C-alpha cells in the first residue's frame, strides 16, 4: 500500500501533529485565525497566488539560493563532505523573507492593511518590514529591549524600511515577551491587521503555513544536491529556535532515508535559565496558542531562557518539531554559546562567509558530525548571514584569533 506523503498528512484539519499544535485562543481571536486558516487553504492553491509568489522569489528575492561545497571547512573537519544551503544570500540576508513575502501576499488577498509581528534577532522584523514596503502596507514590529541593544543594525534597517519598532520592556525583555506584546497589539485590530508570526510556532494555521512557505528551501536543496552529487545527503543539519529554517529544509527529506539533526542552543549550561534547548529539557505545555514541548518553571509558566543567539532565545519549539522528535524522525542535539562563537569565526576564516550566530550553531554541530562520518555527505542549512552580529561579536569576543 502506498503511504500518503508526510507533508500531505500533517498537520490534521485541526492543526495537530500527533498531540502537538492546535489553536488555544481567546474567543475573540478564534474566528480571525479560522478566517486566516480557511483563506490560506483556498488562496495558497490558487493560480494567481502561486504565480505571483514564484515571480517574487525569482525576481525580487534572488532564488534559488546556491548550494555550496565548503571545501576548506570539510578539510578542517577531516571526515564528511560539508555542503551549505546559502540562505544567507536570500534578499535581507536570511531565510525569513521566504515566509514574510508569502504572509504579506496572503494579507493583501485578505484585504488587510497592516502587518504585526515579533522579532528576536531582528531578521523576521527586517523581512516583514521589507515585505510591507514591497506591498505598500503598514508594519509594526515588537522587539525586546535586550535584543534591540544586541541587534541594533537590524533595528535601524526596520526603521529605514518604514516599520514602527515597539520596544518591549517587561519580563526578560526578549523574544517571548515580544510575542506577548505583538499578540496584544493584534488583539486591538484583528479586522485590519494580520499577525505575521515569525516561525513555525503559534496557533494553527501558522506552523503549517510557515513550514509550507519555507519548504522552498528544502525543495531547491534536494534538486541542487542531486544535480551536484548524484545522490541525497546522508545528513541534514539546521539550528532550531522556533524552527522555521529547520522545517524549511527538513520538509523535502522527511520521507527519504536521510538523518535530520535539529541543533538547539545549550547556552551557558544545563540549569534552567542558562539555555533554550526545549526539546532536550522541556515538557509538554501550552504557550502562545499552541501545545508543544516547552521549558517551564515548577508552576508550569514559561521558564527564563538564554542563548548567545537572539533568534534561538525561545522557551518552546514548533509543534511539528516536537512531533518529529517524539516519533524519532529527527535527532535533537545541542551546541553551547562557546562552540557557536568558535564556529562563527571558523566559517568566516575558512570560507569567507560570516554566518549569523544562529546558523553558527548548525555549523558547529555539522563540524562535530563530519569528524565522525568519514566519506559521508552533510548538508547544513546556513540560515542567515552575520552582518547583524558583527558589532556584538567583536565587542564581546574580539576577532577570533588565528584559524
UniProtKB/Swiss-Prot annotation:
Under which name does UniProt file this protein? Tryptophan synthase beta chain 1
Give the reactions, separated by semicolons, that this protein catalyses: (1S,2R)-1-C-(indol-3-yl)glycerol 3-phosphate + L-serine = D-glyceraldehyde 3-phosphate + L-tryptophan + H2O
This entry's Enzyme Commission designation comes to: 4.2.1.20
List, alphabetically, the HAMAP family matched. Trp_synth_beta
Q: Which cofactor does it need?
A: pyridoxal 5'-phosphate
Metabolic or biological pathway, per its Swiss-Prot or TrEMBL entry: Amino-acid biosynthesis; L-tryptophan biosynthesis; L-tryptophan from chorismate: step 5/5
Q: Which family does it belong to?
A: Belongs to the TrpB family.
> Any keyword Nucleotide-binding?
no
Q: Which organism is it from?
A: Wolinella succinogenes (strain ATCC 29543 / DSM 1740 / CCUG 13145 / JCM 31913 / LMG 7466 / NCTC 11488 / FDC 602W)
Q: For the modification N6-(pyridoxal phosphate)lysine, which residues carry it?
A: 96
Function statement: The beta subunit is responsible for the synthesis of L-tryptophan from indole and L-serine.
Q: Which gene encodes it?
A: trpB1
Q: How does it assemble?
A: Tetramer of two alpha and two beta chains.
Stored InterPro entries:
Trp_synth_b_CS, Trp_synth_beta, Trp_synth_beta/beta-like, TrpB-like_PALP, TrpB-like_PALP_sf
Q: Which GO terms describe its cellular component?
A: cytoplasm
Top-level EC class: lyase
Coiled-coil spans are none
Provide the GO MF annotations for this entry: tryptophan synthase activity
Q: Which UniProt keywords apply?
A: Amino-acid biosynthesis, Aromatic amino acid biosynthesis, Lyase, Pyridoxal phosphate, Tryptophan biosynthesis
